[in-house]
C-alpha cells in the first residue's frame, strides 16, 4: 500500500481509484502548513499538490514517485527542484478548460452590463432611484472586440464562446496558433484594439507584470480587463490607477498576486467584480480534476508515463 499526501482538503469525489492506498489529507476546506508538509512528505510516495510546494519541502520527499498538480497552473510547485530529484510533476489542463472559460465569459457579462455594480447599489441605496430607462447604461458583448492574451486550451475555449456572443476575437500568444475563431496579432496591436482583454497565459518570469502602467496606457479608453489566469500577470497598482482614472471601464478578477489577500483598493471600486479564485469550482470539474490526478499517480505506480509531465522528465 502506497501513501499519497494531499496538500489541501479537496472534495473526495473522483479519488475512488486511490482508496486502496493510504490517503493523508487535512480537514475539508483546510490545508497543511509548510511545517506539516515537511513532516509528512518523507512518508509519501506521491503528492497531490493543491497549492505551493517549494523546493525545500520537495527535497525531503525521498520516496516520492510523482507530484500531481491539482490544476492547470503549476507555478506554485518548484518544478526545477522536483526535476533535480528525479520526480515528475504533472498538471491537468484539460479538466479545468470549460469551467474557467465559462467564468471568464461570466465576468465579461458582469462587468459589461454592470451586474455587480447594480447588485451592490440595490442592496445599499434607495431602489426606486435605480430604475428608469437610460440609467446606468452598460454595453453589449455583441460587436465588440475581445483580445485574448494566451491562446492555450482555455484561451481557445473563451474565443469559441465569445464568437457565439457575436464578438470579434483577436489573440496574442507566445506560440501563435491557427484558429478559426480568432485572428493572431502582436501585443501592442491587441492592447490598442480590444474592447475587452482576457488573460489566459501562465505566470512566468516573462509574463510577470505584463500589464503594467505602460500597457494600460496603450489600451483603448473604456476597455475592460478580465483575469482568470494568475494575479501576478497584472501590476495591481497600475490597474487600480487605470480604473480610478476611467482609462478602464471595469475589471473582472478571479486571481490576485498574494492570495488569499485581495487588495482593498480593488474591493472598494464598484466597477470591479471580484471572485475568490473559483475558475474550477464546480462539482463536476473538481471531481474530474481528482480523477485525472488519481490516474496520473496510478500510471506512475505502474511504471507507465503519466500524461502532462511539465518538468521535462
Regions found by a protein language model. Give the residues of each.
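An N-terminal-biased, well-structured beta-alpha scaffold segment characteristic
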Residues: 1-90, 192, 212-214
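Short, Asp-centered acidic motifs that coordinate Mg2+ and/or phosphate
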Residues: 45-46, 66, 196, 224, ...
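Rossmann-like adenosine-cofactor binding region
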Residues: 55-58, 168, 174-265
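Rossmann-like dinucleotide-binding domain for NAD(H)/NADP(H)
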Residues: 85, 221-313
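Glycine-rich Rossmann-fold phosphate-binding loop(s) that bind the pyrophosphate
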Residues: 151-152
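N-terminal Rossmann-fold NAD(P) dinucleotide-binding loop
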Residues: 155-156
